């Protein structure tokens, strides 16, 4: 166990409250002591950090230790506090994804979908709409970046080049099912074999899925993939097929449920505390109430006090809610920098809560560190299975709609090519480009507050170049 003093972290438990849920916990009295420490040591700068939302408690505490080590500095009167708000679901999600993917039925379905989709997109082993054979598929799946050459052939396929009948979707699906059945029988498989799928509402309380025949299931998944290509909402060939296969075969419940629970906790941390007391208080709101009092006291005394907000991955969601709560209920508070590291918040959330906060003077400056598109597509979540980054997985599987717009995805916020006609992406692009954007890898910029060379989504909050950049950023007032 980490022996980190409680002045360096605030642990948000179930429902975003102070209720204990693990080995580490925070009480309202601990937060009182934190602000007493700030006053007693005449702290002039406070960095508030939010780690990603799917990590476990131990990882959250490790992040708090990294922040303490890198940003707490007595000579400059700088203190750092980390919100440890773990859900611990990432290991569960990866374990379930990996377990399901090793299932023979899953692999069988995946291979048939690859064959049908590849043929419909007009490519094959050598291009020209040839059906990919089993040895080619299996060889590709053993690569770190499966079907990379095929992706290069497809590029950002325009809808006109995709074989998809938007005028008769029902008929197109029926024809796909016929084609699936024919292909399956040709390989001496049973097209009528039944497979459990995730058709029922995950919130309905019925853990059993529907049973679909192999042929019908393959057709439904191929239909979903081809529709995403036609509507230009795909995440390239193999990741899209994997996403849609998981959406149909049961396992996406784990990811969507975990992600939804995490977002709910990020919201509840800053819910109203009226009528609550003790450990039932919402940790974020209680923290803000004391932060506002401390900020006003420093202001009235003519003393310096700058507040810096830094959020990694889903920590950006918590910060969006913190900014909204500040705007509505703690209007005397003003922040200096808001720094996002590979943010996993939806663009519409930031447009609704983050942009207005800056326009209204709640914070002065914004900076985002994230990966270039080509690096994002080399950061595999699950090796040999989901070969793009966590942000793509969130966009393609964890949100309700496919290709949900996520703020840290370079391919999306560039608002170019197939993303050029999305109004929300134009809005987010305009905001990002009018502020500061650091893309990995960049360690040659003349401005050393823009350096980053993180090539993994999870590394931004412990990447030396990025940490030094944040330090340079918050020291520029």
Language model feature labels by segment:
Residues 22-38:
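A short loop-to-beta-strand scaffold at the N-terminal edge of the catalytic core in hydrolase folds
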Residues 309-315, 319:
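Gly/Ala-rich beta-loop-alpha elbow adjacent to hydrolase catalytic centers
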Residues 62-78:
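Short amphipathic alpha-helix adjacent to the substrate-entry channel of hydrolases
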Residues 44-53:
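Short beta-strand element of the alpha/beta-hydrolase
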Residues 54-60:
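Short substrate-entry loop that stabilizes the transition state in hydrolases
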Residues 1-26, 87-163, 189, 195-306, ...:
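Lipolytic serine-hydrolase domain surface
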Residues 75-89:
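Conserved alpha/beta-hydrolase
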Residues 37-45:
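Proline/glycine-enriched tight loop/beta-turn segments at coil->beta junctions
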């Amino acid at each position: 166990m980490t022996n980190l003093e409680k002045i360096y972290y605030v642990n948000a438990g179930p429902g975003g409250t102070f209720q204990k849920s693990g080995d580490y916990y925070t009480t309202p009295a601990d937060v009182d002591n934190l602000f007493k420490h700030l006053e007693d040591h005449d702290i002039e700068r406070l960095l508030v950090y939010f780690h990603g939302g799917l990590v476990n408690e131990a990882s959250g505490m490790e992040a708090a230790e990294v922040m303490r080590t890198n940003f707490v500095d007595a000579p400059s009167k700088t203190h750092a506090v980390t919100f440890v708000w773990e859900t611990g679901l990432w290991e569960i999600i990866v374990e379930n994804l990996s377990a399901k993917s090793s299932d023979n039925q899953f692999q069988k379905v995946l291979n048939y979908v690859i064959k049908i989709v590849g043929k419909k997109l007009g490519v094959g082993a050598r291009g020209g709409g040839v059906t990919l054979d089993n040895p080619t598929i299996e060889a590709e799946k053993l690569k770190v970046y499966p079907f990379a050459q095929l992706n290069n052939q497809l590029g950002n396929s325009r809808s006109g080049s995709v074989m998809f009948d938007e005028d008769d979707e029902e008929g197109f699906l029926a024809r796909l099912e016929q084609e699936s059945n024919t292909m399956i029988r040709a390989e001496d498989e049973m097209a009528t074999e039944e497979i459990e799928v995730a058709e029922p509402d995950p919130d309905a309380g019925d853990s059993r899925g529907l049973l679909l025949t192999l042929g019908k299931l393959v057709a439904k998944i191929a239909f979903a993939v081809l529709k995403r290509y036609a509507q230009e909402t795909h995440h390239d060939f193999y990741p899209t097929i994997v996403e849609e296969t998981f959406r149909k075969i049961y396992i996406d419940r784990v990811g969507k449920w975990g992600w939804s629970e995490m977002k709910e906790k990020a919201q509840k941390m800053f819910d109203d505390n009226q009528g609550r007391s003790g450990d039932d208080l919402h940790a974020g709101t209680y923290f803000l109430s004391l932060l506002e009092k401390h900020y006003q006291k420093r202001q009235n005394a003519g003393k310096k006090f700058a507040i810096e907000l830094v959020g990694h991955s889903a920590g950006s969601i918590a910060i969006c809610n913190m900014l909204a709560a500040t705007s509505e209920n703690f209007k005397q508070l003003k922040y200096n920098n808001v720094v996002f590291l590979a943010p996993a918040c939806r663009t519409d959330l930031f447009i609704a809560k983050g942009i207005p906060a800056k326009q209204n003077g709640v914070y002065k400056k914004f900076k985002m560190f994230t990966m270039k598109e080509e690096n994002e597509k080399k950061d595999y979540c699950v090796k040999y299975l989901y070969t793009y980054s966590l942000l793509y997985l969130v966009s393609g599987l964890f949100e309700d709609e496919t290709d949900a717009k996520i703020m840290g995805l370079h391919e999306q916020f560039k608002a170019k090519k197939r993303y050029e006609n999305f109004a929300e992406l134009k809005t987010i692009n305009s905001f990002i480009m009018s502020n500061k954007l650091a893309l990995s890898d960049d360690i040659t910029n003349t401005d050393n507050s823009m350096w980053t060379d993180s090539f993994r989504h999870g590394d931004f909050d412990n990447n030396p170049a990025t940490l030094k950049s944040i330090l340079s950023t918050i020291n520029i007032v």
